[in-house]
Amino acid sequence: MAIRNYKPTTPGRRGSSVADFAEITRSNPEKSLLRPLSKSGGRNNQGRITTRHIGGGHKRQYRVIDFRRNDKDGVNAKVAHIEYDPNRTARIALLHFLDGTKRYILAPAGLKQGNIVESGAGADIKPGNNLPLCNIPTGTVVHAIELKPGGGAKLARSAGSSVRLVAKDGPYAQLRLPSGEVRNVDARCRATIGEVGNAEQSNINWGKAGRMRWKGVRPTVRGVAMNPIDHPHGGGEGKTSGGRHPVSPWGQKEGRTRHPNKESDKLIVRRRNAGKKRK
């Protein structure tokens, strides 16, 4: 993938860029793997906003991705196409199995149309192949990792992300996550070799608010720009800094939201680099 920069023909085009989609080999998705996808607008079943800044955007259909890959062990598959998926930053690969089945998987970097991929404990160590962590050599870069055996991939699924297998210790495999955290995961969990493709996705400059609206992202209004009835930072004579530590519209302090005594903390070998703390 490469980034194509626009010429500044309009204010919205100035500085904006777009992916060139050179790796895409087919524009029409596999119909048997499509599902309807309705929009919530960030509302719950009572019509109340539960997640702000969501609404509108282009209509989409969901592509069913195989995140488990545990029922085709030993069955080779050919990469028929690399496709665009509007529901994620990564590209997806359409696999045609020898038994006639068709599946979508996340397309790792380097996977091309016509390649052969496989899954199972005896699979080769090459991009796109899926194996249990206990069968993967230490030092290998992987993505789409399960947290529970058979539970489906949960870690490293977005464009350009990857995890390194740094050690094996009894029933556990130690993984270094993109955040820097080193974590134990059950060695029976599966992972896919390589890193997720489309790594330059993060370098795209969207250029104008309208392109974000096409994605279904609504504006984020600063609290200091609101009235005091709407936000704790609102009001004041002239422009102000808010006058207190940053909080949400409901007074919740900004910072870490993860519970400090989570059950899975015992699996963390080394913490990630510390972020903002709540005061």
Swiss-Prot record:
Basic residues composition-biased segments: 269-279
Transmembrane segments annotated in the record for this chain: none
Superkingdom of source: Bacteria
GO BP terms in the entry: cytoplasmic translation
Record-level GO cellular component terms: large ribosomal subunit
Keywords attached to this entry: Ribonucleoprotein, Ribosomal protein, RNA-binding, rRNA-binding
UniProt-annotated stretches for the region Disordered: 29-53, 224-279
UniProt xrefs under Pfam families: Ribosomal_L2, Ribosomal_L2_C
InterPro entries registered for this protein in UniProt: NA-bd_OB-fold, Rib_uL2_dom2, Ribosomal_uL2, Ribosomal_uL2_bac/org-type, Ribosomal_uL2_C, Ribosomal_uL2_CS, Ribosomal_uL2_dom3, Ribosomal_uL2_RNA-bd_dom
Alphabetized GO MF terms: rRNA binding; structural constituent of ribosome; transferase activity
Composition skew (Basic and acidic residues), residue ranges: 253-268
PROSITE patterns with a match to the protein in the record: RIBOSOMAL_L2 (PS00467)
Physiological role: One of the primary rRNA binding proteins. Required for association of the 30S and 50S subunits to form the 70S ribosome, for tRNA binding and peptide bond formation. It has been suggested to have peptidyltransferase activity; this is somewhat controversial. Makes several contacts with the 16S rRNA in the 70S ribosome.
HAMAP family tied to this protein: Ribosomal_uL2_B
Oligomeric form and interacting partners: Part of the 50S ribosomal subunit. Forms a bridge to the 30S subunit in the 70S ribosome.
Family that this chain belongs to: Belongs to the universal ribosomal protein uL2 family.
Protein name: Large ribosomal subunit protein uL2
Organism name: Leifsonia xyli subsp. xyli (strain CTCB07)
Gene this protein is translated from: rplB
